[in-house]
């Protein structure tokens, strides 16, 4: 009976110590949540293991997530998968269908996301860009001959038009001098000419008469203008002037004819003529409807390119996101109480088995101790 009592007591005490020790060891993983101080001295094993190592745990989890879970290679492989491509195409199709039925104007859509007066801003941006490009272009070619500003093909075509221009000038001149207005103008010119000649002019005018002189000069002028040699002379003159003009540098031409204001004025007129305002006044649906089918056919190709570009920029994007720092901050801010609750709810059965195992080992150790006590 004595021996049985010793065994029972030693086993019970050992089992109790083992079970309680393991139970407290499990609890001390999380508790106490904060360090406890007595007389300014921190009590050992406070705070619990996880609260004490929270910073290190957060850092290690951040490194684990970025180094082993959300890796660039894994994300790239996911982006390149057929499932993601299919989802991207489906999203594009839904977006295209919604936009094609939209009755909002482009301007209204942009204003709804905070962009006010988009048409005016777009026109100003285009004008500013055109000014910058045009100014840079003119400065770069300021000391170059004009022929370098135009393609050789354009120069040849312009030269081919010279006979036509010459013929047009002469035909207009003939029409003018044959008209009453031209005849009257010619009469005034003859009067002015004779007045400048003084007495000689008065004598000629007295003998011939002004109207008689005009009637004689007008046919001769018309005859001269219709003469083939006159056409050839004018054509040669225009070709010579064109060849000289091509050799002018832009700076020389600008100094002579003040070209820059003309060029920029032409630019302003062209921009006003082709203002972007009508585009912004159109509905999104009408803007898309004309090429909706083309977009739908190209959606798979567009999705592939978009995902490929996303994959190329993934490294930089992940660095800018600083996922490791985000995970660390989230772990730092996660309540220890909630973490304890989660771990215990998941591993409650296992923790109980650890407690029971501690009791079993403690009981075995107690039995061994009882044997030694009896033998001694």
Swiss-Prot record:
Keyword Ligase included in the entry's annotation: no
InterPro entries the UniProt entry points to: DUF445, UCP032178
What Gene Ontology terms describe where this protein resides (cellular component)? plasma membrane
Enumerate the transmembrane spans.
1-21, 356-376
Q: What is its main location?
A: membrane
One Pfam family it belongs to: DUF445
Could you tell me the keywords of this UniProt record?
Cell membrane, Membrane, Transmembrane, Transmembrane helix
Its membrane topology: Multi-pass membrane protein
Q: Where in the cell is it found?
A: Cell membrane
Identify the stretch annotated as signal peptide in this record.
none
Keyword field contains Transmembrane helix: yes
State the similarity comment: Belongs to the UPF0754 family.
Protein name (database record): UPF0754 membrane protein BLi01057/BL02871
For this protein's source organism, the top of the classification is:
Bacteria, Bacillati, Bacillota, Bacilli, Bacillales
